[in-house]
Curated annotation (Swiss-Prot):
Signal peptide (UniProt feature, chain positions): none
Pfam families attached to this UniProt entry: Med7 (PF05983)
Family designation: Belongs to the Mediator complex subunit 7 family.
Protein purpose: Component of the Mediator complex, a coactivator involved in the regulated transcription of nearly all RNA polymerase II-dependent genes. Mediator functions as a bridge to convey information from gene-specific regulatory proteins to the basal RNA polymerase II transcription machinery. Mediator is recruited to promoters by direct interactions with regulatory proteins and serves as a scaffold for the assembly of a functional preinitiation complex with RNA polymerase II and the general transcription factors. Required for activated transcription of the MtnA, MtnB and MtnD genes.
UniProt entry keywords in alphabetical sequence: Activator, Nucleus, Transcription, Transcription regulation
Keyword Nucleus annotated: yes
Subunit structure: Component of the Mediator complex. Interacts with MED21.
InterPro entries per UniProt: Med7/Med21-like, Mediatior_Med7, Mediatior_Med7_sf
A single BP term in Gene Ontology: regulation of transcription by RNA polymerase II
Protein's UniProt name: Mediator of RNA polymerase II transcription subunit 7
Top-rank taxon, per record: Eukaryota
One Gene Ontology term, aspect cellular component: core mediator complex
A molecular-function term among this protein's GO annotations: transcription coregulator activity
Length: 220
């Protein structure tokens, strides 16, 4: 069993495995597992079954026991052109050897030279990766900033439009005087005399007044 390879998943565990460890009860009782500490310098760590270390991502050619064809201080553009020209010349030489003398030991030497040129060229290109990553991040952040500025400008434009509509609506409202009762206009109504006489006859005091008037008329 010890000789069997350990099966390691290439994907993280399902969320339920983490949720069970970080419940409210575990957090309240300080039972939730703490995150692992960052690896120390030059420490090897495993992630999804693959070994990693904290060494520089782009190691020098000398540390890999590879012959360096480019100087320490150089112009990358010029050196890339030189390597490209050397690669083309060696490739043409290899073709000549394959045509004239395929069994010549120089054929193997040319293949090794071409391989070494490719390694140096790729190493030189890989040294641009940090700069490329920074430039990509800068472009991405500038794009996000521009999108946010445009969104804020559109929001401000719509806000000004809404304010204009609200101000126009307030301006269209009628202006009322302070003397108006309950904010409404006074309405004058006139009562028909016939309706007034009919209402008076139904009043009990009207009958008493009428009897008194008849008595006064009889005395006279």
């Amino acid at each position: 069993m010890s000789n069997q390879e350990t099966q390691v998943s290439s994907l993280p565990m399902p969320p339920e495995r983490y949720i069970a460890n970080y419940t409210d009860e575990n957090i309240r009782r300080n039972r939730a597992p703490r995150p692992p500490p960052p690896p120390a310098q030059h420490e090897v760590y495993s992630m999804f079954g693959i070994q990693y270390n904290n060494d520089e991502m782009i190691r020098s050619l000398e540390s890999q026991n590879i012959k360096r064809l480019i100087p320490i201080h150089f112009d990358r553009r010029k050196e890339l052109k030189k390597l490209n020209h050397s690669l083309l010349v060696n490739f043409l030489d290899l073709i000549d050897f394959l045509i004239l003398n395929p069994d010549s030991p120089r054929r193997t030497e040319k293949i090794d030279d071409i391989s070494l040129l490719f390694v140096n060229m790729h190493h030189l290109l890989n040294e641009f990766r940090p700069h490329q990553a920074r430039e990509t991040l800068r472009v991405m952040m500038e794009m996000q900033k521009r999108q946010r500025v445009e969104t804020a400008a559109r929001f401000q434009k719509h806000l000004e439009r809404v304010r204009e509509i609200v101000n126009t609506a307030f301006s269209a409202l009628p202006v009322l005087d302070d003397d108006d009762d309950s904010g409404g206009a006074k309405i004058k109504t006139e009562v028909d005399p016939l309706e007034a006489n009919a209402a008076a006859k139904n009043d009990p005091s009207y009958q008493h007044d009428r009897m008194l008037c008849k008595l006064v008329d009889a005395i006279e």
